[in-house]
Amino acid sequence: MKVNSINTLAKASVCAALLTLVACADQTAKSTGAKELAAIWPKLDIAVKTDPKVEQRITNIMQDMSLEQKVAQVIQPEIRDITVEDMRRYGFGSYLNGGGSFPQGNKHATPGDWIALAESMYQASVDNSMDGSTIPTMWGTDAVHGHNNVIGATLFPHNIALGATHNPELIKQIARVTAKEVLATGIDWIFAPTVATVRDDRWGRTYEGYSEDPEIVGQYAAAIVEGLQGTPEDNFLGEGRVIATVKHFLGDGGTVGGDDQGDNINDEQSLFDIHAQGYVGGLTAGAQTVMASFNSWHGDKLHGNKYLLTSVLKDRMGFDGLVVGDWNGHGQVAGCSNESCPQSINAGLDIFMVPTGAWKPLMENTINQVKSGVIPQSRLDDAVSRILRVKIRAGLLDNPSPENRALAGKKDIIGAPEHRAIARQAVRESLVLLKNAKQLLPLDPSLNVLVAGGGADNIGQQSGGWTITWQGTGNENQDFPGATSIYAGIEKVVTAAGGTATLSPSGTYQAKPDVAIVIFGEQPYAEGNGDIANLEYQRGKKTDLALLRSLQNKGIAVVSVFLSGRPLWVNPELNASDAFIAAWLPGTEGGGIADVIFSQQDGEIKHDFTGKLSFSWPKSPNQTNVNRYDKDYMPLFPYGFGLQYGETSTLGNDLSEDSDNGKQQALMALALFDRSVQAPWKMALSEQGNTVPINASVVSAKSLQFRTIDRRVQEDAFQLQWQQSTSGQWRIYNDFPEDLRAFSEADGVLTFDYLLNNTPAAAVWLQMSCMDECPSDLDISEHLKVDATQDWQSLTVALSCFTDKGADLSQVISPISIRTSGNLNLTLSDISIRPDTANGNLITCD
């Protein structure tokens, strides 16, 4: 079934097909009082009805629960921060694994390893020997484009691509597959779907949204919830089903400037019309959980917004499931910390998501706050009753333990061929053809084809963020058994037809090809880290454009396959391409691209382009929030655009290439670690000749350990722990040299923030390395200071310190490394090379 685009989107309320289930909002409501609440926010006809037997069971369970047992139900720690014995002692109501968190910290954990951890936690939770409780816990995970934390899983195109398919039935199939693969690892609950209506494409989570059109978001939300959970008429939360979460409530796609965790200043009518339609769809379909958002609404953090969480969501819309927080999001509420936040639970939060060691003081403080009356007993009881309601509906109080469930440990489910076939279909249907000069496509598969670009044979790049690791970084093709890179898909089709497919990321060749297919685009990122200042692609250093132009100048026809998590300003790249495809982030089944761009051997079309833009495409870098039905709507490609074979492409090679950025082209800071290591840089530990890539949140190399921590937001810093190592080293590096001479000419500096927990026991060496041997060690021991208040400090080193010692900045392969041979506990954040700022604790080496 295909979705027909709506003809109009009234500024007031979307009263389309989806909203026939509810009363459409009063168009004239302006304020937020009680009457206006009733007018703006609908009472939903939710598919899952109240069951008196379930309610009586909740009452029976709760009458025997102690205060401590009740509070344990509202605490959700992370697997890196608790042990099985902690679960046995406290009986947490739920727990999670964050992105990049695995059983035993092993990125390559098998389905059996996941099942073993699930079983251990389950058995500990029902063991009443220490906490007196037998209520089973439940495990939540971010399975946002398939079971994306697990090696070998089927990874689907990200939501922005699925929006281009305009096919909610396909979305439902994807949800069913995801549920099965998640259940095969013993997990009960997934934190999906994201139902943000994205209005500013600078937001780093744009690719998690299906569309800028709220109607599409609402329809998709209903489809994916039904696929994950089933329906009351079709095996609701039965075998093969998981608990769904609609997130993030509310308005995360509409913050000022596209700022992640920023402020949404829409009026209340727009908040409903634009940003609430995913909840209308998802909750009506019976979603059992809602995740509160990091963002604010008019300055008030959603984790503490009682009006929206309780008055709107629970009381008016009729949601009777549970509201879970996001990663220590409660700590951002005014007057709160990660360790204490009665404001959040009083506002309507039912579960604190509390990674890090903050879970223990939070639990203790919450118990004391209930005892003192700061948190009313009735509010705690309501939260616990909601948690139990979800568990009972999901069968968790009656089902066998994780290792004894129907799909548990079935390895053949993970990445099953029939699952990959659905993912490949999704890739085909999501591709949007933006340009096809002289009907270059489809290509004859018997040609001599050059396959170029950094994304050609890079499954990690084509899969994007939230892929094995949180940011999607640190992955290699071998981390994706059973997957197909875009090049591999092309090579298979071309070889079968008697043609030749040559992989050359740099675009070099021996025999001139008939055509070049260049796969390029954004490097993986996730929330926060993906926020950008404007929509210009490869702002500053346009290496991909240089590749396209070099091929075009040699008379080679160029097909561009653009990998991105959002529409970007690519006018120069469009001009340098004969055909241009928006491929989004297709996931593990790269063969879907070859399915469409090549004809059959007899010249007949095998699969046509059917994808249509669900996001408007900008005509300038600063057209950051161009959306359908906007006043003066003038994108480069409008919502719904997408060519098919045989249609005339009117786009020439004369698009304006004026970036309109003016002085913004000046030398900018080079971020090395900004909430995560920045592509193309990578991190590694080494000791005694043993090098260990940092591709997970906890990594060890003999006596040197790396662990991500939270400074301001999730995993935006990391701790290095040396234990009398034999010169253990941490470094940021690249496989290819980078020319950093422009920074030296600008009196540049290397700078980072740090926390030091102990005085260095031995010399601490800071080094910058280049392609050829270039010794540049600096002993920074005396500059690292232990701060008694544990405040962050900055250390800034002039680049001249390195060049004076012989560093060649024209060929830098490691811009920073730190090594020592003594005990040291050092935490780092915000690492960059920048023009001289004359700030911080500057080391000049004069």
What do the predicted segments below correspond to?
Residues 808-815:
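Short, surface-exposed ligand- or partner-binding patches at beta-edge/loop junctions that are enriched
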Residues 2-26:
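Gram-negative bacterial Sec-dependent N-terminal signal peptides
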